[in-house]
Structures are given as C-alpha cells and as structure tokens.
Amino acid sequence: GICYDVYMSHTYKPDLLWMEPFETILEPLEELYTSAEPDAFEIFLGGAEKTYAPTVEQKKLRSSLKSNLPESRYVHNIVPDPQNTLQHFYDEALPGNSVAQIQNVAELRRVRDVNINTEFYGKIEINKDIAAPEKLHMDASIRTAAIPISNTPLLDAVMASAKRNFNPPDIQQQNDPWAFARYLVDRFVDWAFVPNFRDTIAKSYKKDPISFNVTDYIEWKATRDGAYKSALEAECPEDMVELNLEKYDTMVKKRIKPKLTVAAQYELAQPQVIVSMSKHDTAPFTSIFRQIFRRFESALRPEVKSAGMASDTDISDWLTDFKHVIDAYSAIEIDAGKFDKSQNLLARMMESLLMQELGLDPGVSEIFEDSYVGRVSSRSLGLMFISAYQMKSGAPQTMLGNIIYNFISAMEAVGPGNIALMIAKGDDNILWLKPGANVDSAVNKMSSLFNLEIKLIPNSVLYFSSGYIVPVGDVYHFVPDVLKAVELLGEKGADPRTLPERFVSFSDRVRSITRDAAIPHVLQRIMRSRLGISDLDVVGAVDALACMAADFDTFKRVVA
C-alpha cells in the first residue's frame, strides 16, 4: 500500500555512534507522483513473466579483522564559517584555479572564441569570428574550477571531438576482431570467474536466459523518482511503445571537467559531442542489464572486485579482507580515459560475448545493437564523423561495459599470471602485482590492442574512483577525496530542485570520511604526500564539511 502525509522530525541510523538521532529536513513536495495506472511498458511486457534461472550469489563473510574492532567516529570541531574555510583549503591545494574572475577571463576571450553552448544555424567559415550571445555568470559561493559553461575555440572543439570519437577497428591491429574478442572473453572467464563457472553456473544461465519481462521492469521503475516516471510516460503518447534505437540527439557537453593541476589550468577546455538516447529507448533494457550486472559481480572470484555497485563500506571491507596481500605486494594504478566514447567495435563484441556467458538472451543483444552510433552529424560544430558501434550517452549498459573493458584490457596488458589482486570501477583500477612481475610492455599493449592512452602509477599513494585507500590500524578504509567534495560544492548552475538529493549524497560522502576518529589525520598525511603540499589543512576542511553535513541550512547557504 501507499501511505501519505507522514513526516518525521528525526530518524535513527544504525551506523551512527550510540544510535544518536540524525536530523533530517523534509521539504514539502510541489507535485507528488501518484499514478497507480500501469505505464505503456508494463502493458507491453505484461505477458512476459520472469522465467530465467536465479542468480547464484556468493556467501560473503564480514572481515574477521573489522568485525573485532570497535569503531569510534570522528567528532568534528565547530567551524563558524565553512565557506571561507573550504575556499582557503581549495586555494591552498590548487593555487590559481579559483582566484581569477572567471567572467572577466571569458570577456577577454570572447572575440576569438566560439561559445560552444550556442546552436549555430548557418555557414561556419574559416578564419572568421562568430558572434554568439553569451550570458556572464556570477562567481559561485565557493569558487572552484567546476564551471558548467566554457568558451572554446572552434578548432579545439573540432579536434577534441574528433580525438574522442574517431577509432576505427583496424587501429587495434586485428584482422578478425570478433575472434580476438572471443579469445579475450574466454581468457577473462577462466581467470576472473569462480572455478568451473562454465561447467556449473553458466549452463543454468544459458538454459533459461534473461529476456524482457515485466517483473524486472517494475522493480527497476520503483527505484526512479516521480519526475523521471512522468518524463518516461510523456515519451509514450497514448500508451504506445515505439523504440527508435537508431535515433539520437547531439549536443555539446556544457560542463567542462576541472583541471586538477596548476599547469593544466591554462590548457584549453576539451569539449565533446554527446550522442544521447531517449528515456523510453533505454527503459526496457535497463532492468535487464541490472540483472546481468548482479550476475557479473557474483561470478567474480573474491580476489577480483567490481566496485560498480559497491558502497564505500563494501570497498573498505574488501580491502580489509585482503590486507595481507595489500601489505605484501606492490600496487599500480592504470590511468586510462575515454572508455565509453572512444571504444567501439571490439568493446561492443567483448561485452556482448560476456553478457551471453552470463545468460543474456541473444535476441536482446540483436535488438540492442541498433542503438549503437554509426554516422553522427553535429549542428553545433558543423561536423559529421563516423564512429562504428560507439556507445551513446545514457546507454543502459555504460557502467557494466566500461568495467568489462577495464578488466579485460588490464588483464591482457599486465598478464593474468602477474595479478594477485584487482579492483575496478568504470575506467579506474588498482592492481597488486606478484613478485617479479614485469609490466614494461603494458603501455604499448594498451595502446596497440585496446586504443587506450594510459599512465602506470607505481607504488604511490593509492587513489581510486575519486577516493583514497586509508590504513587505520588493521583496517583499510576507502575514503572519498576531500578536494573533490569541495570542488563539487562550487559547481554553478545546478538545478535548485535537486538540492535535497545533493544534500543526502553529500552527507553520505562526509559520513565515509568521518567513520573513524583517526581517518582525517591519516588522510591529511596521505593528501599532503600526493599533492606535494606539506602544510595543507585537510583536517580543517573535514571539520567544515562535517558542519555542513550536520545542518541542511548551512549546506544550502554555502552552495546556493
């Protein structure tokens, strides 16, 4: 049933010390989604029931080390002015990134630059300036490099888009990429999955494969908010389901990622053309790929960790379970980018083959392959380029596809026999290598076989998925990057209606930083070492973040 008009002044969270009350601010909703009628997809899938084989789950035991160690949460100091404290911290960590008046810089460059956020209708001529209306914005409360709009010269926009989107399969030096994909997937399954996976679990998966069904769709839809459901139904007029997988919309990405080094702040922004899918085209596939993702993570042996659906606590528990390996072996980060937008035919083949190993109905893959991008034309940049089998933005298998490509490329480049332990999420990973492992050829293999430009970062402070691995006694904690948390607070142009959701996400991030009393001080030493700043006040920044996480009004005042 559904219960309305229930408001709580506070709730209790079992992970807080001594079950202290956690104050929650509940904003009244302007419009409550109350539709109890089945939508077009429920009607369309109504005759398709959930008949596939159940997912085999591994029994996961809590870390013996962590279960015996009582946690004492960090008690933060009161910071009268969190905004000023965080601004000072950011300026100390990345000097020069936030001190410039951004709108004045944009004014100086306006004559020779093109505002890529404006649609141009007409002929773009070489060596001619294009006048475009530009709305100057005021500085954010906390000035960081996370500015959502930017001016970029047309030539740089063209080159950035071409570099990101152009990757013909023959670059990967394979005459038969399908056979190469089959070889890589077979090798990965034998190395990364639980022993005898093909002879036991895989047989039941393939016997009763996962296909379209109304049960998984309703389960997925229940996790969406009212605004998303309303938008989804609006795309299906008169309850008609019509998939246009070959259709796409193009736009130039507005938010330019911040530059994390002093030298890089003077580089030109790197925009890209976003080729996106509509909500109703992804809806029937998302619920299926969620189940495949669960099977993928359950099939991995304990030494190979996918953090795609893992919380900070889950990652911390896994790190603690393998503390003996982490302490004994050397680690490397493989820093590679452009997984989803530049990888195409080989990546799509590998994910398709691996999904079939996990029990995806081949008929689903045959339908979904129409969603991949072929020829793209951008009205914004006056471009047309070909990118065979590129993944669209918003594709339902984006995270799973990235993790699959991440695992397989790292395994093949480094060698499965050299890897003692590995964790991956998106395009981030850390590998702990066995003694005597030689990874000198890894960079060349990544480039020639997988079209990835990588950097090997050995024996440094471990940084993974915007977080640090922090040792505290006999426990390893995965702690979000304080600098990244501050950076996101300075983002300008966010929808004010999302402020409550941003506060909840922000509070969860801060709770991971303060889950143990020793974390802020150890994290301070780690960040000082990685950033090369001996007097960076990380503890003071944590105190300021904790003050904001404890009070919604303070959070709202800083980010508004």
Describe the predicted segments one by one.
Residues G1-A560:
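Viral RNA-dependent RNA polymerase
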